[in-house]
Amino acid sequence: MPDTIVAISTPIGTGAISVIRMSGSKSWQICQNVLLRKTKIEPRKAFHNYVKDSDGTILDEVMVIFYKSPNSYTGEDMIEIMCHGGIAVTQSILDTLISHGARPAEPGEFTRRAFLNGKIDLTKAEAVKQIIEASSRKTVKLVAANLAGRLSEIVHKLRETLLGTLAKIEVEFDYPDEILTDPYLIEKELNDAILQIEEILKNAQNRLILSSGIKVVIIGKPNVGKSTLLNTLVKEERAIVTDIPGTTRDLIEVPLMINGISFTLIDTAGIRHSHDEVEKIGVERAIKAADEGNLILFVLDATTPVDENDKKILSLIKEKKYIVVINKIDATDLIDREELKKILGTNTHVLTISALKKEGIQRLEEEIIKSVKDLIQQTDGYITTQRQYEYLASCRKELSDSIEAFKKKLPLDIVAQKVKEALGSIDKLLGTDYTDDLLDRIFKDFCVGK
């Protein structure tokens, strides 16, 4: 029988209330042992009481709710204790429950038990974590549909359809001398399944980018003001700023919110030819970050003419989406605009700013939003994790292989095997086929108490 687990479910800190959650077969027994008054309980009804410690001293006035198995979040007997939201009082109640036999919960253990007890599948479990971590309204909307079970519902229906198709194929295989099903119908059902998967996957990469934060990479040669720009955009000192070129050697990643859209802003080492081994590593990382970014802010220094280092950087990013940012316009402007236009071409966005004086920053933010509009707009759908994407893409490939085998009139057991492999990918997506390692990876980053 699983241990009875306990954890604080609300953020640690001072607030109006804290919630302590306990799940397992001994939940009510342990709870009774710490309550001042013996109470007759009704499931899902809050009641008033006091929590006492082992010597009978009252710790706090509380409200308690009991959830009877299987009608609870975890599918087990569950208790929620709502106490005053102080750090000391909440921890004291938690310690008292542990001293009476409850075990401190691991990260995500309540949701893991909900999955293992059949209350949710893995798509819903992932949605729980994502809605807690969502940093923008757009991401909340994307994830909420899966929390309500939309992706799960669609994929379960797809699974049922494929099971029916597999049954038709296996009947043909078992009775080869009889024509029991129109071959065209089998092929059509497989094609329809592929079309359905493609509809689910449509714009999925954009949704994954949006949910994790659109990557905006700041690049340029040393001492052009990249770190100052990062600090100005995030409105705090996150990167070290000095007049010494090459101060930034490693990537600095900072979350940024603009108009409710979540970004990850990345400051990089200045790109130039160098014999310094550490600086060379920083330059390599900067180039790699630019290659992986969704948008580049290419920073030029208004106080120095465009040189070969600038041109080299431009050659590295010319296939990417980028904005040219001329910084330090509060000082002497030595950049020849006509020469710059020849180098960049006429369609390149060029903005002038002073990161130090915070001039032109609002216009830059507006241009950033405009530049990623395609990512922001094309986000309808339900795929919100790379794991979901990969299993559905695998399912699509296996179904395509089954159609090819069918068209080539290969033995029907080969066609059936491909459909079974497609179903296997769906089972892994939903979690009906899982390993402990997979669950560990999914739940390890959950907060304790969820």
UniProtKB/Swiss-Prot annotation:
Chief location bin: cytoplasm
Bound cofactor: record note: Binds 1 potassium ion per subunit.
UniProt-listed InterPro entries: G_TrmE, GTP-bd, GTP-bd_TrmE_N, GTPase_MnmE, MnmE_dom2, MnmE_helical, P-loop_NTPase, Small_GTP-bd
UniProt key word rRNA-binding: no
UniProt-listed PROSITE patterns: G_TRME
Keyword Magnesium set for record: yes
Ranges that cross the membrane: none
Gene Ontology molecular function, alphabetical: GTP binding; GTPase activity; metal ion binding
Residues annotated for GTP binding in this entry: 223-228, 242-248, 267-270
Enzyme class (EC, first level): hydrolase
Essential cofactor(s): K(+)
Keywords: Cytoplasm, GTP-binding, Hydrolase, Magnesium, Metal-binding, Nucleotide-binding, Potassium, tRNA processing
Leader sequence residues: none
UniProt-listed GO biological process terms: tRNA methylation; tRNA wobble uridine modification
Gene3D superfamilies: P-loop containing nucleotide triphosphate hydrolases, Probable tRNA modification gtpase trme, domain 1, tRNA modification GTPase MnmE domain 2
UniProt GO cellular component terms: cytosol
Similarity comment: family membership: Belongs to the TRAFAC class TrmE-Era-EngA-EngB-Septin-like GTPase superfamily. TrmE GTPase family.
UniProt function note: Exhibits a very high intrinsic GTPase hydrolysis rate. Involved in the addition of a carboxymethylaminomethyl (cmnm) group at the wobble position (U34) of certain tRNAs, forming tRNA-cmnm(5)s(2)U34.
Protein's UniProt name: tRNA modification GTPase MnmE
Gene name of this polypeptide: mnmE
